Each structure stands twice: as structure tokens, then as C-alpha cells.
């Protein structure tokens, strides 16, 4: 069973998140469909989305960046040299392509190492589950708010639909 996209977005908004940007992924379609009508800002690259989110935070917004896990690799330098160093929080919503599922070959490596990459750079994360998504969102919102650090919600195929 899946979390409805509207419920997931509603949970993010309940925690005050109000600026959404990123690069699309089919695993995130239900979320993106919901956000399109609410001012979602598409970015050409994930590191660009991180920059947009940092600017939004400095302007008083609470940003979320949506991306595929391959985009985590693209955005690591921005996260490490901007967000982590200067404690500029961002909530990352990352699809888990190639993670414990059969997927296209280009997703195999990132699927295997996504959680280790996050652990290596000390970005807390939760893998979103249907029965745990409320707690998952709350836990990562707390990291964002209290520690002023990036935090990630990882979305498996079909977890949000």
C-alpha cells in the first residue's frame, strides 16, 4: 500500500515547508503532481536546486529539494560546502532508484550506495513507509528545525502514489 501524494505533501506543509524545487523522477510523480499547482520550481540540476533552496531559506522560507538518488551525487559538493558548513537546512526528498529492486542498470550503483553516502556526509535520513511516514516527516523536520542541517526522506518505488 502507498501513501497518497496529497497526504505526503500535506505532512510536509504541516511542518511548515513552503518552498519546493528539484529535478523530477518518476518515483516522485504523485508528489510532483500535487506540487505543480502550488508553485513547484523545476531546476535543471540538483546542485542548482540546492542553491535555490539555500536562497529560499535565507529569505525566510522552509525549502524542500526533490531529486532522484543519482542527483545526490551531483549535489554532494553543494551540500558539503554550503549547507553543512554554514548550517543551512534543507529537506531532501530522494527517490531510491535501484535500491533493493530490479531497475535500469544506470541505477544499480547509486541504489546500492545512497544510504552510505548520506551516512558518510552525516545527513540523517529515513526511508518513508506507509505506516511510518508521519513519524518520518516529523523526525526529519525536527533535524531541520533544531539542528539546522540537511535531512532526507528516501522514497522507494511505489511508497508514495
Give short role names for the model-derived ranges.
Residues 1-161:
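Thiamine diphosphate
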